[in-house]
Swiss-Prot record:
Protein name: Lantibiotic epilancin 15X
Pfam families (alphabetical): Antimicrobial18
GO MF assignments: signaling receptor binding
Top-rank lineage group of the source organism: Bacteria
Highest classification ranks of the organism: Bacteria, Bacillati, Bacillota, Bacilli, Bacillales
One Gene Ontology term from the biological process aspect of the record: killing of cells of another organism
Keyword Cell membrane in record: no
Lanthionine (Ser-Cys) cross-link, renumbered residues: 36-40
PTM per Swiss-Prot/TrEMBL: Maturation of this lantibiotic involves the enzymatic conversion of Thr, and Ser into dehydrated AA by ElxB and the formation of thioether bonds with cysteine by the cyclase ElxC. The next steps are cleavage of the leader peptide by ElxP and membrane translocation by ElxT. The leader peptide may be removed before membrane translocation, in contrast to other lantibiotics for which the cleavage occur after translocation. This is suggested by the probable cytoplasmic localization of the serine protease ElxP that cleaves the leader peptide. The N-terminal D-lactate is probably produced by dehydration of Ser-25 by ElxB, followed by proteolytic removal of the leader peptide by the serine protease ElxP and hydrolysis of the resulting new N-terminal dehydroalanine. This hydrolysis may occur spontaneously. The pyruvate group thus formed is reduced to D-lactate by the NADPH-dependent oxidoreductase ElxO. This N-terminal D-lactate protects the lantibiotic against degradation against aminopeptidase.
């Protein structure tokens, strides 16, 4: 539940940023967020995401 909620909030933030950024910058933001989500596994970071253990 928390993971889906985090993803929804993240998507809202991206949509809000799109209006301020040009498309290239928006894609860089998305790529950076994807990379940070991969690293955020098994522990909580300041980004607020929490995953339980590695598979």
């Amino acid at each position: 539940m928390k993971k889906e909620l985090f993803d929804l909030n993240l998507n809202k933030d991206i949509e809000a940023q799109k209006s301020d950024l040009n498309p290239q910058s928006a894609s860089i933001v998305k790529t950076t967020i994807k990379a940070s989500k991969k690293l955020c596994r098994g522990f909580t970071l300041t980004c607020g995401c929490h995953f339980t253990g590695k598979k």
